[in-house]
C-alpha cells in the first residue's frame, strides 16, 4: 500500500534526536520555512518575489507565489513532524528543483549561493532526496514480507 493512516500519525520515535536520520529530516523541513517567509514583505507578496516569478515564466506570478508558499509550508511541516515523510521529502526535492530551474532562467548559470547561484537549493534537494530514499526504504521494510527463503534461515540452536 502506498499510503496508510499510519503515515499521518505522530510518533515519539520521529523525535528521537539520537537518530541522525530524524535530525536530517527535521532540518530539511525547517530550512523550507525561510523560503516561505522570504516571499512576503509586510504581510503581502514581496514586489521582488513577484518580479522574480514573472521573469522565471510563472504567470500570474502572485498565484504561483501562493502555490509555492503553501507547498513549501506543507512539505516543511510534514518533514518536521515526520508525517508522510517519503512524499514530503520528494515534494521538497521537486520544489527545490523548480527553484534551481527558476534561478537558471532568471540569472543564468551561477553556482555559489553568495552570488545568487543555486548551490544552496541543489544541496538541500540532494539532502531531501536522501531523506526520501531512507523513508522509502523504512516503509518497504515494514510493508514487504522478507524475501529470504525459509530454508536459508539459520535455525536457533537449543
Task: Describe the predicted segments one by one.
Residues 1-41, 62-70, 74, 81-158:
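Extended, low-polarity transmembrane helix blocks
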Residues 41-60:
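Membrane-interface interhelical connector segments
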